[in-house]
Amino acid sequence: MKMTNNTVLITGGSAGIGLELAKRLLELGNEVIICGRSEARLAEAKQQLPNIHTKQCDVADRSQREALYEWALKEYPNLNVLVNNAGIQKEIDFKKGTEELFVDGDEIELNFQAPVHLSALFTPHLMKQPEAAIVQVTSGLAFNPLAVYPVYCATKAALHSFSLTLRHQLRDTSVEVIEMAPPMVDTGLNQKSRDKQGLTYRGISSEEYVQYFLDGLKEGKQEITNERVEGLRDATRADYDRLFEQMNTQEN
């Protein structure tokens, strides 16, 4: 993926990794559009980054995804990079049945269905561009799950698998498929549960990870993690079992 002169759409771009990525891509000479559910957060992002374009959209809603696609192609016909960043993370205890499954959002719809659907919508357009990319934001937990976040981890594992197959299908086109698999990053993602689990401020900053991601792009990497995640991704079966037990021994 080239580093400049792109037109980039970032879902969930009003905070955290999405906003930091938008900031850095603007600095590199790209045109950047962010979308998010909150008009207030989008306005704050616009105030912070006056050159950014914003669009209110809840990508957990299928009809809004389709409307976003139509709007984006009409307003930005040269759009050549899609970043599927929007996501939520929930602590769910299945001993409680369905009590927590759909409260505060549907992880499967937002974390997996939305990026799959958006990828399908935009791919025909992206294939017409001389250079294009789809960036999927997964997680280090795609490689070894934290049991307190069971559905989140499963959606990220599914999105990792989807990224592999989509990359294979598009291998002879102009569209690169790039996976961002960050470690724990100190954003507002699921702050209440992180506080409860003692995970607050134990991650790296958005600035640090986005710099790592951009460095990976320069090197031509298609799957960009960091040293923390590489240990999970590259684990042997024995290591995997040990890491799973280690990661989940302090589960509440």
UniProtKB/Swiss-Prot annotation:
Provenance organism: Bacillus subtilis (strain 168)
Active site feature: Y152 (proton acceptor)
Domain of life according to the entry: Bacteria
Gene Ontology MF term list: oxidoreductase activity
Name of the top EC class for this enzyme: oxidoreductase
UniProt binding sites for substrate: S139
Keyword Acetylation among UniProt keywords: no
Keyword Cytoplasm on entry: yes
Record localization: Cytoplasm
SUPFAM superfamilies assigned: NAD(P)-binding Rossmann-fold domains (SSF51735)
Protein name: Uncharacterized oxidoreductase DltE
Binding-site positions, NADP(+): 9-33
UniProt cross-references to Gene3D superfamilies, sorted A to Z: NAD(P)-binding Rossmann-like Domain (3.40.50.720)
Main location: cytoplasm
Keywords annotated in UniProt: Cytoplasm, NAD, Oxidoreductase
Gene Ontology CC terms, in alphabetical order: cytoplasm; membrane
Family: Belongs to the short-chain dehydrogenases/reductases (SDR) family.
EC number(s) per entry: 1.-.-.-
Entry-linked Pfam families: adh_short (PF00106)
Consequence of gene disruption: Cells lacking this gene have no defect in lipoteichoic acid or wall teichoic acid synthesis.
InterPro entries assigned: NAD(P)-bd_dom_sf, Sc_DH/Rdtase_CS, SDR_fam
